[in-house]
Amino acid sequence: MSKKVVVIGAGFAGLAAACCLAKAGYQVTVLEKNGVPGGRARQYSADGFVFDMGPSWYWMPDVFEQFFAHFGKKTSDYYQLQRLDPSYSIFFGEDEVMHVPANMEELFAMFERYEPGSSRNLKKFLEEAKYKYEVGMADFVNKPSHSMLEFVDLRLIKSMFRLQMFTSMSTHVRQLFNNRQLIELLEFPVLFLGATPAKTPAMYSLMNYADMALGTWYPEGGMYKIVEAMVSLARELGVDLQLNQEVKQILSANGLATKVITQDREYTADAVVGGADYHHLDQQVLTPEQ
């Protein structure tokens, strides 16, 4: 009989974990406290209008394709994408708006308008960013991170300086550009990481490659289409999704989870995966002993 796994939270992380576990042969139940799946990416409807509650941009389309390919699927099996042009607009002030073009030649021309000669530096910047993206995704992000030994690789160690691990993003950008608006354009993607450019390694200019080279996309029908796609995939794989089930407690014995308690039900488990907010699980669900 297959082992039972309970996944807490039906956001992107919880749904992705559930799909992978189900494919591996586990009997998976996902518990979601809200009445709809999606977590921070859930949807809200009122008076005939529909609102995405969380993410508004679709970057790094290759990551989504890679996820669905793991199950023999494509994103286009579930939703259609449109590349946005302009990618987005930045409002520096009431009369100061920068429309960032999707076309690379138009992007170079825009940089020239703000700072003559800067397009040459942008090409250099994006060439370096492409290398960081390819190495960063293959050798860091896509590794399971079970052990630090995964990263003890002579090739990686040699590439540390090219990845600019010891230079800040702020310093890196200012070495190539002087215009205030261009600097702010190139620095803002690292804010998605929850850090400031001054305290973020320049390796994360890989985010600029994702932005300017891979583009900003939007699923037709809204970002919630991604959630619907992942829910559909999970159900195709046999995942049991239970809504309105807020986890109150995890029971354990000999250091192993045995049962998950919600407001009105109990779920036996051989393993539990926490896909909800770490702080909430740590402070509100787990006991100090756990």
Can you say where each PLM-predicted feature lies in the sequence?
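N-terminal glycine-rich phosphate/pyrophosphate-binding loop and immediately adjacent elements
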Residues: 3-134
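Flavin (primarily FAD) binding-site architecture
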Residues: 274-290
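Conserved acidic residues
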Residues: 4, 258, 270
